[in-house]
UniProtKB/Swiss-Prot annotation:
Role: Can catalyze the hydrolysis of ATP in the presence of single-stranded DNA, the ATP-dependent uptake of single-stranded DNA by duplex DNA, and the ATP-dependent hybridization of homologous single-stranded DNAs. It interacts with LexA causing its activation and leading to its autocatalytic cleavage.
Keyword Cell inner membrane belongs to the record: no
Protein name: Protein RecA
GO molecular function, one term: single-stranded DNA binding
UniProt keyword annotations, A-Z: ATP-binding, Cytoplasm, DNA damage, DNA recombination, DNA repair, DNA-binding, Nucleotide-binding, SOS response
Subcellular location, record wording: Cytoplasm
Organism: Nitratiruptor sp. (strain SB155-2)
Gene Ontology biological process terms from the UniProt entry: DNA recombination; DNA repair; SOS response
Family the UniProt entry places it in: Belongs to the RecA family.
Gene this chain is encoded by: recA
Amino acid sequence: MDTNKQKALDLAIKQIDKAFGKGALVKLGDKQIEPIESISTGSLGLDLALGIGGVPKGRIVEIYGPESSGKTTLALQIIAEAQKKGGVAAFIDAEHALDVLYAKNLGVDIDNLLVSQPDFGEQALDIVETIARSGAVDVIVIDSVAALTPKAEIEGEMGDSHMGLQARLMSQALRKLTGVVHKMDTTVIFINQIRMKIGAMGYGTPETTTGGNALKFYASVRVDVRRIATLKQGESQIGNRVRAKVVKNKVAPPFRQAEFDIMFGEGISKEGELIDYGVKMDIIDKSGSWFSYKDIKLGQGRENAKAYLKEHPEVAQEIENEIRRAMGMDDSVMMVPENEMSEE
């Protein structure tokens, strides 16, 4: 760059620093590249699929899927993992349907969980913005977008038309939230439902998420959660097999997916994942129907091996550490350059 241009640029930077504060405009080469921190999802496979060991801190995340697919369970597991690391979490219960005992069973510290049950959408999103601006909360979960009903709709008459009100509300809120959560390093997770597009024909999926298109664009990560099988023990249903697909990822390559078990009343089965990934990575030996780790016989059949790991958490932790090392997930901080790898 010639001398005159450099002088003009230096002057412009000084003016910007004076108007907006030092560091408002910097050369990327002068700024230290910081690693992207993450919060574990409670699922080894999903942590791997997300590419950085969990959901990114300081970003907006959307978890969506059909009813009873495990969306809220996954969000509560993320809260539990954040709390285990000493983090503070908030749950905005717009659906007024939080099961406190279930959350406790998943490992959530309910005594220290911040909970709000707002009356309408604007109130919910104002609360989210206020606690995000405090910089004291690590993760905020909103359950769900569909329940963020605008005040005008609640106060209106049944049958009144309120076309596009919720979409406008979400668009306005996300414009304000994106910068705040990044600056304060707070992860905001929106749980969303799916609907069928009216009059959808031809190619492409007939499904869409609620609340307009704003969340699709502002979310750094979008995870599609689907139930793919029912787990049974004899005639009794004991859980669901779930597939989680990362359909958008701005911090790592997208379109990876993971499968894991969600057990009724317990949440994500970490023991099941340890066995699946342990066998896949030759950390656990499978001979016929027997599973063994080093000189330890874990049991005959997958359910017995899971039961052994549940009864012997020190063995489960040792296996998990080996798997995480093999996956390159020793820590929740992964050195991945920030990029815009997927817009949808």
